[in-house]
């Protein structure tokens, strides 16, 4: 008998699909429809707020196509909780106008194919990687997102029997399969849940994305992979868009959901600000100018969310990458050890550009900078970075505006000269109105890689310096000593 890979299980999952009896709905008195909508919206909002649970996630989705009208997705710690939710919905007045079209029961799973060390030698797995795998078992549902759910199984035909293959061969194919999926990190988030012994097929796959074509693309590309092409068998696909329970009246009235806020275009066809979100890139100039942008709406969204975790985020001017930074009072060696574990996992993703620890030139603090190709990937990484030891509020928290000058990478022969120049500039800054604090942060792995962190009373005060002759002279001088052009980002 072939070996079975070990598995670990997390939350139980219920995908509950309903069709609406539109004839009965249209014929119902207005007061009955209003009462039914109020009842259902309250019920669904309570499920999303975990009014009757300690942990979990719930979401409401409109479904496009004839298979269903509504999809309710619930993650809970036990099957009993899902059973109670399903029966409780049937007690609502709204349920009189619906009929269950489909349901699917599963449990979130990770397997030894993708995480052998996690199972074989758990003590050797660093905390960052362990947190990553454990987060897979308790997934989040993005706020404003498209969804594609489908069940699948592995074939057991005489010439295509997945379960007869040696485990090493299966693991190798799954590794290639996983590498393909990683190309969509930051664009598509997935939840893999086992339904072996729980439902008709073997897994339930739930894909979330801001751009529905990203879901189409990942499924399309994976169809050509050997795991899917030879051994994959797929069930029906359910495709839709999440909307808040409060928009249920708009859904039943045939209006757009999610309902626009502040105008017809308030919700773009793929905008969201929740964790695991995505954002379009914008083009910059050639980097020679030194005016600065405070970022677009997506940038503002990620900054606002991460600020709650004492993580500061922004987009380097003229770049299509996103950066997050946090400050810690942990020792450099201890912090680096933690970050190195996280970085090992980050580097599995094509959207990862760089994660590094920087030590203060003057202040007794460290910074962790993580740079990604997409806002959503930076946002996701920040969730793990927030768990690093001794994360603190930024020094000079009384300021209303901060800057992080990134990638001042000097030519090795000019590094000492650059540090000396910084000390001179810091002296000028100390006398400037509205300036609170500035420090040079140096990469603990590369002395030539630095960024300057500043705190100002306001953006106007900071801009006064960046427009000054002193700064212009420094920029001119820097062209001769820097190995690459500097990147700047404002962090409000």
Curated annotation (Swiss-Prot):
Region annotation Disordered: where it falls in the sequence: 253-301
Keyword field contains Metal-binding: yes
Residues in coiled coil: none
Keyword line: Heme, Iron, Metal-binding
Annotated positions binding heme: 177
SUPFAM superfamilies noted in UniProt: Dimeric alpha+beta barrel
Bias kind Basic and acidic residues: ranges: 264-301
Listed GO MF terms: heme binding; metal ion binding; oxidoreductase activity
PROSITE patterns: ABM (PS51725)
The UniProt record lists the keyword Protease: no
InterPro entries: ABM_dom, ChdC/CLD, Dimeric_a/b-barrel
Record domain ABM: where: 402-490
UniProt similarity note: In the N-terminal section; belongs to the ChdC family.
Protein name: Putative heme-binding protein VNG_2021C
């Amino acid at each position: 008998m072939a070996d079975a890979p070990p598995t670990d299980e997390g939350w139980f999952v219920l995908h509950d699909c309903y069709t609406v009896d539109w004839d009965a709905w249209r014929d119902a008195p207005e007061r009955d429809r209003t009462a039914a909508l109020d009842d259902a919206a309250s019920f669904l909002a309570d499920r999303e707020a975990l009014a009757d649970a300690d942990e979990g996630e719930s979401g409401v989705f409109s479904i496009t196509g004839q298979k269903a009208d509504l999809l309710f997705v619930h993650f809970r710690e036990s099957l009993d909780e899902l059973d109670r939710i399903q029966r409780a919905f049937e007690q609502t007045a709204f349920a009189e106008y619906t009929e269950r079209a489909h349901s699917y029961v599963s449990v979130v799973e990770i397997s030894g194919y993708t995480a052998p060390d996690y199972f074989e030698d758990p003590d050797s797995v660093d905390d960052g990687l362990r947190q990553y795998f454990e987060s897979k078992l308790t997934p989040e549902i993005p706020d404003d997102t498209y969804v594609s759910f489908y069940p699948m199984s592995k074939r057991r035909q005489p010439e295509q029997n997945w379960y007869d293959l040696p485990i090493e061969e299966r693991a190798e194919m799954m590794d290639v399969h996983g590498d393909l999926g990683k190309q969509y990190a930051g664009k598509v988030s997935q939840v893999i849940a086992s339904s072996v012994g729980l439902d008709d097929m073997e897994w339930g796959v739930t894909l979330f994305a801001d751009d529905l074509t990203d879901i189409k693309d990942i499924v399309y590309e994976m169809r050509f992979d050997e795991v899917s092409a030879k051994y994959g068998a797929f069930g029906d696909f359910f495709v839709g868009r999440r909307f808040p329970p409060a928009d249920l009246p708009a859904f039943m009235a045939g209006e757009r959901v999610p309902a626009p806020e502040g105008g017809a275009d308030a919700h773009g066809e793929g905008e969201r600000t929740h964790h695991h979100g995505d954002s379009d890139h914008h083009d910059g100039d050639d980097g020679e100018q030194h005016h600065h942008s405070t970022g677009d709406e997506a940038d503002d969204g990620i900054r606002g969310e991460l600020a709650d975790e004492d993580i500061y985020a922004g987009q380097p001017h003229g770049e299509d990458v996103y950066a997050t930074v946090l400050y810690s009072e942990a020792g450099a060696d201890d912090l680096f050890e933690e970050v190195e574990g996280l970085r090992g996992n980050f580097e599995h993703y094509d959207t990862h550009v760089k994660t590094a620890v920087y030590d203060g030139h003057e202040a007794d603090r460290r910074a962790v900078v993580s740079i990604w190709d997409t806002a959503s990937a930076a946002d996701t990484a920040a969730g793990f970075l927030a768990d690093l030891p001794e994360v603190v509020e930024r020094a000079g928290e009384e300021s209303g505006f901060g800057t992080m000058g990134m990638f001042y990478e000097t030519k090795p022969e000019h590094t000492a000269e650059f540090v000396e120049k910084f000390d001179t500039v810091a002296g000028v800054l100390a006398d400037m109105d509205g300036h609170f604090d500035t420090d040079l942060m140096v990469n603990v792995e590369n002395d030539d890689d630095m960024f300057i962190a500043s705190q100002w009373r306001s953006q106007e005060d900071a801009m006064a310096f960046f427009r000054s002759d002193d700064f212009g002279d420094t920029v001119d001088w820097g062209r001769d000593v820097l190995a690459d052009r500097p990147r700047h980002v404002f962090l409000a």
